[in-house]
């Protein structure tokens, strides 16, 4: 998550946002769960100010020199993500500190009906069950490649 896919996300890091942001966003952020698993295991209601640390973290991480990062990284995300900015993730991946395919590897999920319609949670039994086996195999294969 290197950029929130919402034009109002920038206010998360504005001065004194903890005081006035709830006036704009409301005190609580809520969403309707997509299925029983999400209703049971996910937080579907939380204080709007809980998003402020995420905004600060995104700002701080984007300010880093990612060219210095030599740790292998697998970026597995959808270009159609409606929650975060896929182009921001791609920008960071391209800046990562080694050649493409060795340290910063890109994987593309093949989302199908029944998977997350927001293309954000690209694996897992609750949101994208059709992707989980493929992602596990992809991660294990990637780990073998970088050994």
Task: Describe each region flagged by the PLM.
Residues 113-125:
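Short helix/strand-capping connector loops at secondary-structure junctions
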Residues 13-22, 96-99, 127-130:
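Short, surface-exposed linear patches
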Residues 1-57, 63:
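Alpha/beta-hydrolase-fold enzymes
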